[in-house]
């Protein structure tokens, strides 16, 4: 069984990834504020071991406001206001999962610790500038992460919200994994079909049908 050290270690030896990390380092060194902090960039892999992954939720790039991003897609630190997309995720959960109570914070570590890989496809961003690090090579790295999960694991659930995530997920073998798609939970698109998608109960039904412990979504 592979682990993240194998996957990330192999990629870190590649020139493209060394270039990515160098570009981020140079941006920080030049005085730019880059999110998340250096020690949090790879948190998705720290909280969810390769062999423990049950569900993959793909985000795009980190939140670009102060004190928000901490390396898990959609998640924010406990003391920070819940961002609109995450609020809509919670709204769907209240409709989808019996007994789910609207959380008071957006800190999703509890999901990560249960096997929900909260993976942004770009792992850094400059303060106040969405998608500013979109062309640094992160996409190639996260494509590799998805490919390795697809190949070396089975019976995973991939939640792909919005066209960006769905494009990233085209390679996933749908005979071995469950792939659920919906519009992005952003206020701009949630009403086009994210609300009512019931992805959280569908995820748990699939896991349980394969003898895998379901996710407790309550935060």
From Swiss-Prot:
Swiss-Prot/TrEMBL catalytic activity: Hydrolyzes single-stranded DNA or mismatched double-stranded DNA and polynucleotides, releasing free uracil
One Pfam family it belongs to: UDG
Cytoplasm listed as a keyword: yes
SUPFAM superfamilies linked: Uracil-DNA glycosylase-like (SSF52141)
EC top class named in words: hydrolase
Record GO biological process: base-excision repair, AP site formation via deaminated base removal
Residues annotated as the enzyme's active site: 61 (proton acceptor)
Keywords: Cytoplasm, DNA damage, DNA repair, Hydrolase
NCBIfam families: PRK05254.1-1, PRK05254.1-2, PRK05254.1-4, PRK05254.1-5, ung
Family as reported in the entry's similarity comment: Belongs to the uracil-DNA glycosylase (UDG) superfamily. UNG family.
Free-text function comment from the UniProt entry: Excises uracil residues from the DNA which can arise as a result of misincorporation of dUMP residues by DNA polymerase or due to deamination of cytosine.
HAMAP family xrefs: UDG (MF_00148)
Protein's recorded name: Uracil-DNA glycosylase
Gene name of this polypeptide: ung
């Amino acid at each position: 069984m592979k682990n993240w050290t194998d996957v990330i270690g192999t990629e870190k030896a590649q020139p493209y990834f060394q270039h990515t990390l160098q570009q981020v380092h140079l941006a920080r060194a030049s005085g730019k504020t880059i999110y998340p902090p250096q020690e949090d960039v790879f948190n998705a892999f720290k909280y969810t071991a390769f062999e423990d992954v049950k569900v993959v939720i793909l985000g795009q790039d980190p939140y670009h406001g102060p004190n928000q991003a901490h390396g898990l897609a959609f998640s924010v630190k406990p003391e920070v206001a819940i961002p609109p997309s995450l609020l809509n995720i919670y709204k769907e959960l209240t409709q989808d999962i019996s007994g789910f109570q609207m959380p008071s914070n957006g800190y999703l570590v509890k999901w990560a610790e249960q096997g929900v890989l909260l993976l942004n496809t770009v792992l850094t961003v400059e303060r106040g500038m969405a998608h500013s690090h979109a062309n640094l090579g992160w996409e190639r790295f996260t494509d590799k992460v998805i490919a390795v999960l697809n190949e070396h694991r089975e019976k995973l659930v991939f939640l792909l919200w919005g066209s960006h995530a769905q494009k990233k997920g085209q390679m996933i073998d749908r005979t071995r994994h469950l792939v659920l798609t919906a519009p992005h939970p952003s206020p701009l698109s949630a009403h086009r079909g994210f609300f009512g998608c019931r992805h959280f109960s569908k995820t748990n039904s699939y896991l349980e049908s394969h003898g895998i412990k379901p996710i407790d979504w309550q935060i």
